[in-house]
Amino acid sequence: MEFKKALGYDDISLLPNFSDISSRKELDTTTRISKNFNIKIPMILSPMDTVSSVKSCIKMNKIGAAGVLHRFMSIEEQRDKCKLIKDESSFCITAIGLKGAEERIRATSTYTDIYFLDTANGLCKNVEDFLRWYKTSGFSQDIIVGNTLTKESVYRLANLKADGFRHLIGPGSMCLTQMKTGIGCPSVTGNYYAWKAVRNWELSQVDLFKDDKPNPNNRPSILTDGGIRYPKDLVKAIASGSDAVICGRIFAGLLDTADEENIIEKDGKIYGKYRGMASRDVVEDYELYDGTRKNLFVEGESTLIELNKVDTIENVVYDFVNGLRSAMSYLGFRNINEMRGGIWTGSIQAVINSANNIYEGFAHGK
């Protein structure tokens, strides 16, 4: 049997195209994060309890990106926080789990524009049953489901009217899923699976005998979840099919993401907690284990990050979006839709790197 080869962000480099762009100010980074919702900057703050808060979600929303409020709180607290975010920044996105989903949705729907379903594996009966229920329940908010990884998972959930996908399993900086289970796929190839599945699904929705074309407004979004470390990763995520990226680590350790309960003083220094949502700390804090501690299974890590008193959410986001704009000018694309998936359509040329190329790409003059 011949195994398929899979590539990650560090495995490829993009080649420039002819460009008639005279200024990066001409470029539009607006993207869709669900069927009915756009943002101006294709970056989403992950619903992790050590970076996602009312203040961080409001800041992300106000600068044109998006923050997703995490779900690990009482229903009443989540409702009140959703209201604060909605009132301060005009829209709110929040996470829900499968357990108790209906009660949470009913409590928060007045103040919520998009729901993110928090599940490790979107290719399962429970997720499909939930999505069938949600789409017939009368709620109007878009629903992002996942996590997906294969073409099958994306296509099946698209058929059930998902408005978008949290895509990829295992690339997050605090995620141990690939190490613990062997499940995962490098990000560029993983993004291709979602891009191809959505393209196939779009074609299945048109009547070819009437010479119809796919309706771009009916397409579910692809949101790459994890693995984003540098602006180049955002660029390559979009070039390989993503609409936007979901990030946690790049926002960890900032004063405007760390809530007071997640700040620790140690040896005269101030640290912020940062942890994966399947880490031992989270599983124990929220009692997510099954009956006894013997059934506690951990697929994430926890760490302390010295608080960065200089950088802000705005600085981080603008650094990434400026890198994206620069890449768009090299590639000759004026908007995200032109660029998205260009590796697969042939509008972007990519080369496979040698093992040593990563060192050339970093500043190395010191």
Where are these regions (language model features)?
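Alpha/beta catalytic cores of nucleotide-metabolism and tRNA/nucleoside-modifying enzymes
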Residues: 1-25, 182-224, 229-366
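Active-site entrance/lid segments in N-terminal catalytic domains of soluble metabolic enzymes
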Residues: 1-212, 216, 221, 249-254, ...
